[in-house]
Amino acid sequence: MYFDPLELLPMIDSNHDVQRWRVLEIEFSAQLEHPDPYRNLELDATFTHESGLKLTMPAFWDGKKSWKVRFAAPELGLWTYTTHCSDALEGGLHLQSGSFDVHAYRGALPLYQHGFLKVSRNKRYLEHADGTPFYWLGDTHWLGLTAKERFDDSNDARFASQFGGIIEKRLEQGYSVWAASLMIGEWNDASGSPTPLW
């Protein structure tokens, strides 16, 4: 399983180390007041590699005047970006641009060593972007993201966190995929009383 924090950057500068396949977050700040930015504005960023490859990612409103876009560069080298806002008068969001260099990943996570997953040429398997086979060994943890799952304690003496213990065990066992249900309906506890999901 792959776990790694995002690269959270309020702005990119030439000193920052952007690594291939790692998620990069760039923040933009609106200059104007928008009564309902979530529904009334759209913001996209087009990322262009020095080879000419172009990828467009939607940005998202993050409250107040903050907008963010996340991008994981699939190629090494120089990338530039330009934003396009549905309100061309919004100077803090429209036609913002910048550049950054992407370097090789130096960590141990296979996702960043070999790239995102894709369907193999014969359409029978999953493989990483560089062709490395991906072995899907997964577990579905139906209560993993609900109040039924204990984050701060555990009913198993081996683990301080019930949730953390399950993740640790699956990593130890070589699992590559973990899934959980976000919406499973109302479940009752042992006494028959309903408990909150969150």
Predicted features and spans:
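Ligand-binding face of N-terminal immunoglobulin V-set domains in extracellular IgSF glycoproteins
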Residues: 20-25, 30, 34-44, 55-102
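Active-site-adjacent substrate/metal-binding segments within catalytic domains
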Residues: 54-70, 78-82, 91, 109-198
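Extracellular interdomain linker/stem segments of modular secreted and single-pass surface proteins
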Residues: 103-109
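N-terminal start-of-chain detector that recognizes signal peptides
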Residues: 15-19, 150
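Intrinsic structural disorder
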Residues: 1-2, 79
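Short, compositionally biased P/S/T/A/G/V-rich stretches that sit at domain boundaries
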Residues: 2-15
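Intrinsically disordered, low-complexity boundary segments flanking structured domains
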Residues: 11-14, 44, 121-123
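Conserved aromatic beta-strand anchor motif in extracellular beta-sandwich/beta-rich domains
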Residues: 47-49
